[in-house]
Amino acid sequence: FGSDSISNIFSSGKSLEAIALASLVSQGLLAYDKKVSEYWPEFGAAGKGELTVADLMRHEAGLAAFKVSIDPKDLLRENIKQNKIGAIIESHPQSFRENGSEREYHAVTRGWIVNELFRRIDPEGRTIGQFISEDVNGPLGADIFIGVDETHIPRVVPVTPLPIRYQFKESLKPSIMGRRIERNIFQTASRL
């Protein structure tokens, strides 16, 4: 690990998504109170027509998980621009928690949805990764990536997962005893 290493920032990337959308708002191209389907008509399919940009950003889209498998190749920039992920999002219905709450953390899916929205509104049709590279990294001399190309792979630090025994043990701890994992293994399994 060195000063030029690239490490996964996981959910900290949501701040980059917010910056990208705020850029569109500042240009008058996007409004948080508008429906996502006003910018991306196909998104309104499967009962999602009333969902606003603000709902999406507050993790209230009802799209916290998809009931389909995503081919990792579909996440490559050229496939994103061919609407591989967008088509999945368009056809997917909303699904809310059993407790009736509309809010559920969209750990992975929000980034995909926001990226699809962004690229449809951006005058150049860029992905958020391209926006960060061109409009943030260049002017600020930053070194941030959403998606890396082959030239940067040697700089990427691999993610080392916590040992499964630790995860299992922590998942069984009652919340009152400082459980560090949101759901225990049985709650997670019941949602699959």
Regions found by a protein language model. Name each.
Residues S15, G111, G129:
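Conserved glycosyltransferase catalytic-site signature
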Residues L21, I113, I132-D135:
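Structural preference for long, well-ordered alpha-helical segments in enzyme cores
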Residues K48-H59, R103, G141-I164:
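Charged/polar, low-hydrophobicity segments characteristic of intrinsically disordered regions
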